[in-house]
């Protein structure tokens, strides 16, 4: 069977070049006589893999020396708890609610302290990013938390919130390495990277060193203390070795393709193709305010649930898979992450035009 165009929100499409390299090395990684799946995380082979991955990531993102890079497990959902456990010194933090994942992080933080809603776009089904220029931040807040790209609803912060000097924590799960960022504007950047970077099972966290201390909330498990992981170079216990190996290959692919500035241009070009069609379509329509549209996740609807289902079914049969919207919102969603080729978006739009002609 030929490969399909995979529009899954995550785990998601990976560069074919990376998959081919991994396939070639599956039985024998660089003369080791072993697959990376089989080798010890304490081996020289894997030590080189994880160090090389960090080096390439630091180069791609221009990560300052006073930030630690951690390769972790547990998904973004576990990290929802790690943030307050490690950062809530005053037991108070501000959260901006722009979708399901910010809501879940907010609910988790409430377990550990006084989590305050600073702004929300729930009033319009999270179809926009609220004004974050003058948030009701108080002096005793330990940090301000955002989900920078909202995978389900298809919104993206185009400008970071004014945190009034407070530490900014950002979940970038679905926009990680899709464009250049100024790491120094954040205290913590993290994501479950099974969208733009690798397979499921790897969390990458970039944390300013002064925030990595023994001063965690009482009862914080040893494994969930960032200092435990930082002191052991992400090797306190067995890490997700194969996932890190694939991430490392994606980092090298991104560098080979020209880096994050080039990736942003490519991602903007792909998104424009799809959004331009949606803006003139008589059948399909987007669901997000134009100024807040994500380059990564594009939700759309026909306005008829039965027609939506028909579209998803026929698209799947035509080789455009995983277009069904998240179960909480319905409709459709095309996730066009960095590894999705422009051709995939162009062919999807061709199919949508054909479907519109037959069903409008």
Where are these regions (language model features)?
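A glycine-/small-polar-enriched, mobile loop at the entrance of the PLP active site in fold-type I
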Residues: 3-54
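Active-site phosphate-binding strand-loop segment of PLP-dependent enzymes
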Residues: 10, 109, 120-176
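Conserved PLP-binding catalytic core of the aspartate aminotransferase-like
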Residues: 284-315
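PLP-dependent aminotransferase-like
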Residues: 77-144
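PLP-dependent enzyme catalytic core of the Aspartate aminotransferase-like
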Residues: 2-4, 317, 330-360
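Conserved N-terminal alpha-helix of the aminotransferase class I/II PLP-enzyme fold
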Residues: 32-79, 86, 100, 108
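Conserved active-site segment immediately N-terminal to the catalytic lysine
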Residues: 169, 183-194, 203
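Active-site C-terminal subdomain of aminotransferase-like
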Residues: 15, 193-275, 289, 358-360
């Amino acid at each position: 069977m030929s490969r399909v165009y995979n529009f899954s929100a995550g785990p998601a499409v990976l560069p074919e070049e990376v998959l081919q390299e991994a396939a070639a090395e599956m039985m024998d990684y660089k003369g080791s006589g072993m697959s990376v799946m089989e080798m010890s995380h304490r081996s020289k082979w894997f030590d080189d893999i994880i160090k090389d991955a960090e080096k390439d990531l630091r180069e791609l993102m221009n990560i300052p020396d006073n930030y630690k890079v951690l390769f972790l497990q547990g998904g973004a959902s576990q990290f929802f708890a790690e943030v307050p456990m490690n950062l809530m010194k005053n037991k108070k933090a501000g959260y901006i609610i722009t979708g399901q994942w910010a809501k879940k992080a907010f609910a988790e933080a409430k377990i550990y302290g006084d989590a305050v809603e600073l702004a929300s776009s729930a009033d319009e089904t999270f179809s926009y990013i609220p004004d974050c220029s003058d948030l009701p931040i108080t002096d005793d807040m330990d940090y301000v938390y955002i989900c920078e790209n909202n995978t389900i609803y298809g919104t993206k912060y185009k400008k970071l919130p004014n945190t009034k000097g407070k530490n900014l924590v950002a979940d970038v799960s679905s926009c990680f390495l899709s464009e250049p960022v100024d790491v120094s504007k954040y205290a913590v950047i993290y994501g479950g990277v099974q969208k733009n970077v690798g397979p499921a099972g790897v969390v990458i966290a970039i944390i300013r060193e002064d925030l990595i201390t023994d001063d965690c909330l009482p009862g914080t498990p040893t494994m969930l203390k960032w200092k435990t992981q930082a002191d052991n170079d992400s090797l306190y216990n067995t890490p997700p070795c194969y996932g890190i190996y694939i991430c490392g290959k994606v980092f090298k692919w991104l560098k080979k393709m020209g880096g994050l500035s080039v990736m942003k241009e490519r991602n903007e070009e792909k998104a424009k193709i799809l959004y331009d069609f949606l803006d003139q379509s008589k059948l399909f329509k987007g669901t997000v305010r134009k100024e807040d549209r994500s380059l990564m996740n594009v939700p759309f609807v026909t306005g008829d649930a039965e027609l939506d289902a028909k579209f998803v079914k026929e698209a799947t049969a035509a080789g455009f898979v995983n277009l069904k919207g998240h179960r909480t919102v319905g409709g459709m969603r095309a996730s066009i992450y960095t590894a999705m080729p422009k051709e995939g978006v162009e062919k999807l739009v061709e199919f949508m035009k054909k479907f519109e002609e037959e069903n409008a």
